[in-house]
């Protein structure tokens, strides 16, 4: 299992992949919980899980416990944006726990490390020959 992790820091987002052996450390965590950013190579950072989606694109919802899919009647928020006042829809959402069939995890920075994210993700500049 490989997770795509979207790290959000103020106005900028960065995308990483979490490989098999490191993915086991975030398995079982819920939305709102924090984990060490060293798993992703972000030394000194603490990351808070804000959401995600499963392999079929269904979004994770914070108030649905477990790893199951659930058809929820929603009037806004996760998975649905109403176009008229009072409009409600039954939408399929995912539970709030990370499991094997989650494909994307959204996180935000809760504690910063020594280096900024811009420095960590900066591409090395190639020397130009003159």
UniProtKB/Swiss-Prot annotation:
Q: Which GO terms describe its molecular function?
A: structural constituent of ribosome
Q: Has keyword Ribosomal protein?
A: yes
What are the annotated GO cellular component locations?
A: ribonucleoprotein complex; ribosome
Per UniProt, the keywords (alphabetical) are: Ribonucleoprotein, Ribosomal protein
Query: What biological-process GO terms show up in the record?
Result: translation
Spell out the InterPro entries in the cross-references: Ribosomal_eS6, Ribosomal_eS6_arc, Ribosomal_eS6_CS
Pfam families the UniProt entry points to: Ribosomal_S6e
The superkingdom of the source organism is Archaea
Q: Which HAMAP family match?
A: Ribosomal_eS6
Entry-linked NCBIfam families = PRK04290.1-3
Similarity section = Belongs to the eukaryotic ribosomal protein eS6 family.
Q: What is this protein called?
A: Small ribosomal subunit protein eS6
Species: Methanosphaera stadtmanae (strain ATCC 43021 / DSM 3091 / JCM 11832 / MCB-3)
């Amino acid at each position: 299992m490989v997770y795509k992790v979207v790290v959000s820091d103020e106005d900028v987002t960065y995308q990483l992949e979490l490989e098999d052996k490191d993915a086991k450390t975030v398995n079982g965590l819920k939305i709102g919980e924090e984990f060490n950013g060293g798993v992703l190579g972000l030394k000194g950072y603490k990351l808070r899980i804000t959401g995600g989606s499963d392999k079929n694109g269904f979004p994770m919802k914070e108030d649905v416990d477990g790893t199951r899919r659930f058809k929820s009647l929603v009037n806004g928020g996760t998975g649905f944006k109403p176009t008229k006042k009072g409009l409600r829809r039954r939408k399929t959402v995912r539970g709030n726990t990370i499991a094997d069939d989650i494909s994307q995890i959204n996180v935000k920075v809760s504690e910063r490390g020594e280096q900024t994210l811009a420095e960590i993700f900066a591409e090395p500049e190639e020397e130009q020959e003159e």
